[in-house]
A protein has these predicted regions:
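Outer-membrane beta-barrel initiation region
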Residues: 1-20, 29-30, 208, 257-258, ...
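Short coil/turn segments that connect the beta-strands within blades of beta-propeller domains
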Residues: 22-24, 66-67, 115-116, 159-161, ...
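A flexible loop/linker signature enriched in serine peptidases of the S9 family
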Residues: 9-12, 29-39, 52-59, 72-89, ...
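Short loop/turn segments that connect beta-strands within beta-propeller blades
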Residues: 42-46, 92-96, 134-138, 178-182, ...
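A short beta-strand motif characteristic of beta-propeller blades
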Residues: 2-8, 47-52, 96-102, 139-145, ...
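C-terminal, active-site-flanking charged/polar segments
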Residues: 224-280
Length: 288
């Protein structure tokens, strides 16, 4: 179901909608007339307020329970225009101004964890990745990801108190759990695109093309089952759980990419597969 927003004056894209504690929605908004900005959507008043303009946002934003918004932006070096780094940014949505943690370069996927902690992914230009954890029990703890594995998303689940990552390697793409011993596979590798990983109450939410188009999926960590949650005409993206029964997401219509809500119903089980369905591909004859 579409979220009510002010009628766009031109082609507009909303992305990464996030629920706040008071029932409002934070989303990243872009159009052809203005720079990208985070906006606060009030669905009751049917109003929208800009929080702050942004630069080139490099990975999905995340909101902590205390109301602090985290994201990363690509920033050029003041000395060398061809040198670009992804820097960690944050702001308190009600009272603060956006700030940059300048010492943390090459940061991706900022993820709030327990007790006001924060974790993120760091990368080097040779293709190495590590997960940095800062919390009451850990201070600047680096977890090195084995070489040859790329990180494409990260989320923290409050029920299991673990970080989960989207990993790509020679075997395909899969979800892994970060443990003290290293990475442990949660799903089997497959040649499927997974995206925008989030987590809540023992369940992972993400986008998947297993059905042949981008749809919202969930993985139950207790049962090990995967479910398809949406069936949309042009695809759905950026899931973020409001509670046990409702998701925020992005979907597409004639106005552009718009925020929407999706009911959570664990009815359509997704069987493991190595490749997506050939829904959008033309029919071809098998070779002899």
């Amino acid at each position: 179901e579409p979220v009510t927003v002010p009628e766009p004056e031109c082609y507009t894209s909303y992305s990464h909608p996030l629920p706040t504690a008071d029932g409002r929605i934070i989303a990243l908004k872009e159009d052809f007339d203005r720079p990208s900005a985070f906006v606060l959507i009030d669905t009751v008043e049917r109003s929208e307020r800009r929080i702050t303009y942004t630069g080139d946002v490099s990975t999905r934003p995340a909101l902590s329970p205390s109301g602090r918004l985290w994201w990363t932006e690509y920033r050029r070096s003041p000395l060398y225009a061809e040198k670009v780094a992804s820097q960690l940014c944050y702001m308190d949505i009600e009272s603060g101004k956006p700030k940059i943690i300048r010492k943390q370069r090459n940061a991706l996927y900022p993820t709030p964890i327990r007790e006001h902690g924060i974790a993120w992914v760091e990368y080097t230009y040779d293709g190495s990745y590590s997960v940095v954890v800062n919390g009451p029990l850990d201070l600047d703890r680096h977890n090195t990801i084995p070489y040859g594995k790329e990180v494409h998303g990260m989320a923290w689940d409050n029920l299991t108190d673990r970080l989960y990552l989207l990993i790509t390697d020679d075997d395909g793409m899969h979800i892994a759990r970060l443990t003290k011993e290293g990475l442990k596979r949660v799903t089997e590798p497959a040649y499927l695109t997974l995206s925008d990983l989030t987590a809540r109450d023992g369940k992972l939410y993400y986008g998947s093309i297993a059905s042949g188009r981008d749809e919202l999926h969930s993985f139950d960590l207790a049962t090990g089952r995967e479910y398809q949650l949406s069936t949309s005409r042009f695809g759905s993206f950026d899931p973020s759980a409001v509670n046990d029964t409702l998701l925020l997401a992005t979907t597409y219509d004639q106005r552009g990419y718009m925020p929407a809500t999706q009911r959570i119903a664990f009815e359509r089980v997704v069987e493991p597969t190595k490749i997506p369905q050939k829904m959008l591909l033309p029919k071809v004859k098998d070779w002899d």
